[in-house]
Amino acid sequence: MEGPLSKVLQHIPRDLKFFFDPSSIAVVGATDDASKWGHIIAKQALRSAKRPIYLVNSRRKEVLGRPTFARLIDVPGGVDVAVLAVPVKALSDTIDDALASGVKGLIVITAGLGEVDDAGAQVQREIVTRVHAAGAALIGPNCLGLVDNANEVFLASNAFEPGSVALLSQSGNLALELQGWFSAFKLGFSRFVSIGNQADITLIDLIESSVDDPMTEAIAIYVEDFHDGRGFIQAARRAYEVRKPVVVLAAGSSASAARSAQSHTGALTSDRQVIEAACRLAGVALVNTPRELMIALQAGLQPRRANGSRVAVVTDGGGHATVASDLLEARGFTVPALSPSSQTELRSRLWAQSTVVNPVDLAGYGEQDPNSYADVVTWLLQDPDVDSILISGYFGGYSSPTPFAQGLDKQEISAARTMAETVRAQSKPLCVHTMYPDSPAIAELSAVGVPAHYAIEDAVASLAHSRNLTLGALPDEVELQLPIDGITYCDLMPLILSKGIATPEMRVVHNREEVMHATNAFTGPFVLKANGLLHKTDVGGVALNLPDGEALLREFDRMRSEIGAASYSIERMVDSTNGVEIIVGITQDQRFGAVLLVGLGGVLTEVLKDSVLALAPVDAESAREMLLSLKGAPLLMGHRGRPPVDLESAAKAIAVLSRLGAAHPEWQEFEINPLLVTPIGATALDVRVAL
């Protein structure tokens, strides 16, 4: 049977070159009415004389001073790409006309289909079926168009300044906003595609095409619906492998979007966390705002990367040092004390009141000698205990039009040139927070790709995106198992045991006589559970540590009276001395497939909310890393005299359970809570499935 990744592994990249460098173009719906898309796009298309541009209008002989054709089929020799800007009621016939004329690619601006209602979605599906039957391809509908600057293809509402970034956006208006941001950050576009409803050509296809585009050095994405999440991961990993950074701004992924769930796992799993897990796996930078998207792009395009999180902060004032350090640590960086040898060296380069531990505070020496910045940075860049450097504060001000101190402009520019030369010759990133980002000194640094920001939080974000992103281990392909209908707790516990994971000794009972027989089968203390309940503890359906048969019978009578379950499970009470309860859950995400959650478990799972996510299945090493990334990881390693738990057994159990959950996509939620991990092993104490 096919595994969850089989669709990804069998994906055949589509040749979309004709969209980005067509031999000829037609704009259907071209008009002189400046308020209509047909006018706006036709006017943009005519900016280039590289290829024939045909205007199609069934009612007018001339548009924009050029002769028109009544139908696409009337165009002699046909066209490669047609942009359709027609009313939705005319779209179906227009597409049939285009396909009959031999068009290879359709860019459908028209809205009012799949994004509106089920009837529109059905029409959209029928259109795509006809497009495929004709061997053509379609971008959209409900899109803003396409631009390829290198090939002079201008089929969108606006001009996009040339550059090296491919922008793939599901929102037209956000793309227009990003134009302003790109200009502010001195970046430009290799190409732009408004992906619209992704009825045919998808985000995955366009990522793959952009990876192969020699003019594209980075890919920026705004997406509201990933569709095939695993396909997205595969395509983004291709970009990572050829060193083209991918930055994603994803909408509709807040914690408030978490679905109503029957299990703890579902309640703890938000859309945002799933997307974060997918982006980690793909080596993708995930951002929250258009501004951060620009910061991440700028950082990703510069060639220097930090291989660690140790930052040296250089300032000429204590306030900037304190704020910078706090923000860095909030982003997962450390600002460690420099080695004694580095402190001695820096002390020899500065004056007595300077602080050289880290942060390095020049304490006013910068206005005595701006070259002191270069002296410090040059030394720190070769320090093996430093991964990256942040200058924060006044640097850049001495060469500005309104300097604090006069006559230091040439020295500051000289210092900037020295730093630029030093930075260019090595691999560690330098980032600058400055009150004067437009000064000549900062221009020297910007010329070699050193990011400079007016806001300290932007500078710290830039450093964060300069850290080397690493690819996670791609989940193995798993064989899907035959669905198990109506699976119960009594079925699941033996199934887990058959996979090599310990479970308590158990008997299923229905009446008092069977309870008495069970007490003769094994000794207590006992656990009694009412079967068929999702949250047994909440309704008194679990009784723990029952010492003997008499206590067991009392609890059985109570549960049968109060709950009335069809069956009950009697289990041997497992010794939990020095144990830690873990939750292991697998949910089925409609875009990304099986998602694994690991966290601190038991009855306080949703209170503690200490959990991490990964796409399933995972191997034992990845499971171990997940456990160690929990805030409560010290509990696993031994705490206040307690022995460490058997982490290897826990990791192996999690890996096995992740494969089991991934192999049963009909299990919408599959949860083991708790998995008791002790110094001598791991035991599944409870399990549930929601279909």
Where do the language-model regions lie?
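Catalytic-core regions of core metabolic enzymes
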Residues: 1-691
